A protein has these predicted regions:
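Acidic, proline/glycine-rich low-complexity intrinsically disordered segments
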Residues: 3, 10-11, 18-32, 38, ...
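Residue cluster at the C-terminal edge of the helix-turn-helix DNA-binding motif
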Residues: 50-57
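Juxtacatalytic C-terminal regulatory tail of Ser/Thr protein kinases
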Residues: 56, 72-79
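Short beta-strand
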Residues: 60-63, 123-124
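Minor-groove-contacting beta-hairpin "wing" of winged helix-turn-helix DNA-binding domains
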Residues: 62, 66-71
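Acidic, Ser/Thr-rich low-complexity linear motifs
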Residues: 218-221, 284, 438-452
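TPR/TPR-like (Sel1-like) alpha-helical repeat modules
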Residues: 403-407, 418-440
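Terminal, low-structured helical/coil segments at or just beyond the last alpha-helical repeat
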Residues: 442-469
Length: 469
């Protein structure tokens, strides 16, 4: 019979299980379970009490004045999601002015809060990570031992008037290797706006690099030994594959993650996404979409503050042609995490579907700026907004970036060429849709794209009709 814990109690139990046999300080537990949020010890005590009530009084031992430890004699806990732990250490102030110390610390704290919003990476709060300054390689193992971090973010900030230069690097502490580093600089009036813009760019890229590093580790392990988080990463990689050919493989990884950890809300969310993408983006059957919505609902019930859950729910509602609900969930996702490039991009796509392509292009440009190594679909969504604005040549150029165009991409590209008057290229795209493929370009234009307004579907269909001759 399954046992149920609230998300915070479960996160606490998970961290204790990862540190079996070690006394975990209260400050560390509070940083991991409530990242970037100030809470009192009462919250921690309440979660420990809940674990003991569900699993037994002896499950968690209190070590006076030190912390808590999972009982060594307890039965081995099932594998847990094992999210990576990131510590953002205090940045170096290279301005030469002690008055800038508060600004430099505030910048690093903004990074902590930004990374914490993703919910896919555990980031330690400043009272732990700021106990270290930016140390050299020799001190990295010490940081890992003392605060349990897998990755370290360090850097520096220099200000000269309104000119800001930030250097940042991401370090894998276990291998003592730098995974990523970059420099950001900005000119202009309004120091707060400059700082916010740089934070926005860094946060998204940091999370992407940590996720990619986790995927590389997971790819080297046998599937049977993967933790739930690693299984999730393997499935996520298949969903972002430009070839878009293995959604079933992605589903299998998400299902395996759920089997390992039945309370892993994000695994239900991504399984819902994989199901919703069945049928080439928005053309899945009503039954498939309802199943996807049920899975997304469960994911949100388990992880109500997970922004990805609302983003996926938004996409499913869009595919179900419930445009108001789609925008409602999208705005919640952005409120929970305004740094996520995928959410920013998806907001642009949604606005195109709602008949607001000019607004959409602003959002899409911001998503591309935050994530220059963005997935392929960013450009495809941008192309549709451009088409709706009558910018057919720019739309075609964006679609031409596809290396293995699916029939729906060829249909949109044919419509662009036809609207430009290049009928030879338009008909070539139609001809390249394989013989015997049940895909109908005109049906796709009229019913396969989840436009809110019939006039937008007719606009796309107009180009397709021209291409069909």
């Amino acid at each position: 019979e399954p046992l149920f814990l609230r998300p915070k109690a479960y996160a606490l139990l998970s961290h204790l299980a990862r540190n079996m046999g070690r006394v975990v300080p209260k400050s560390e537990l509070m940083d991991v379970v409530w990242p970037g949020v100030y809470v009192t010890e009462d919250s921690l005590t309440q979660s420990v009490r809940e674990i003991r009530k569900v699993l037994g009084e002896d499950m968690v031992r209190t070590v006076s004045k030190r912390g808590y430890m999972l009982a060594a004699e307890a039965e081995a806990a099932p594998e847990i999601s094992s999210q990576p732990i990131v510590a953002v250490v205090r940045f170096r102030n290279e301005s030469g002015d002690p008055a800038d110390e508060a600004m430099v610390d505030g910048f690093a704290e903004d990074l902590i809060n930004g990374v914490a919003r993703f919910g896919t990476v555990t980031v330690l709060a400043r009272n732990s990570s700021f106990s270290f300054a930016s140390f050299g390689r020799a001190e990295w193992p010490q940081i890992r031992a003392r605060i349990g971090a897998d990755y370290l973010v360090e850097g520096s900030l220099r200000r000269q008037g309104e000119h800001v230069v930030v250097a940042v690097s991401l370090v894998d502490i276990a291998t003592a290797s730098q995974l990523w580093g970059d420099r950001y600089q900005s000119h202009g009036e309004g120091l707060f706006a400059i700082e916010r813009e740089i934070v926005e760019q860094i946060v998204s890229r940091l999370v992407t690099r940590v996720t990619n590093a986790g995927l590389e580790h997971a790819a080297r392990k046998p599937v049977t030994s993967l933790a739930a988080y690693e299984l999730l990463l393997r499935g996520f990689a298949l969903l972002r594959d430009p070839a878009q050919t293995d959604q079933r493989g992605a589903e299998a990884f998400f299902e395996a993650a759920i089997a390992k950890d039945p309370n892993y809300g994000l695994a239900y969310t991504y399984l819902a996404l994989a199901r919703a993408l069945d049928g080439e983006f928005g053309r899945a059957s009503d039954a498939v979409l309802q199943n996807a919505r049920d899975l997304a609902d469960k994911g949100l019930a388990l992880s109500p503050d997970q922004p990805t859950g609302h983003r996926v729910q938004s996409l499913i509602r869009l595919y179900m042609r419930d445009h108001e609900a789609a925008e409602h969930h999208m705005r919640i996702a952005l409120q929970l995490n305004p740094y996520d490039a995928d959410s920013i991009e998806q907001m642009g796509m949604l606005l195109t579907m709602r008949g607001r392509p000019l607004d959409a292009l602003t959002w899409l440009a911001r998503g591309i700026r935050i994530d220059p190594l963005h997935p392929h679909w960013y450009q495809f969504d941008r192309a549709l907004a451009l088409y709706m604005m009558g910018e057919y040549r720019q739309a075609a150029e964006a679609l031409e970036l596809a290396t293995r165009p699916a029939p729906w991409i060829r249909t949109r590209l044919a419509a662009c060429y036809a609207q430009m008057g290049d009928m030879e290229k338009a008909r070539r795209q139609i001809a390249l849709i394989e013989d015997g493929d049940p895909f109908s370009p005109l049906d796709y234009a009229l019913r396969g794209v989840p436009f809110e307004n019939r006039a937008d579907a007719e606009h796309l269909a107009e180009g397709v009709r021209l291409a069909l001759g």
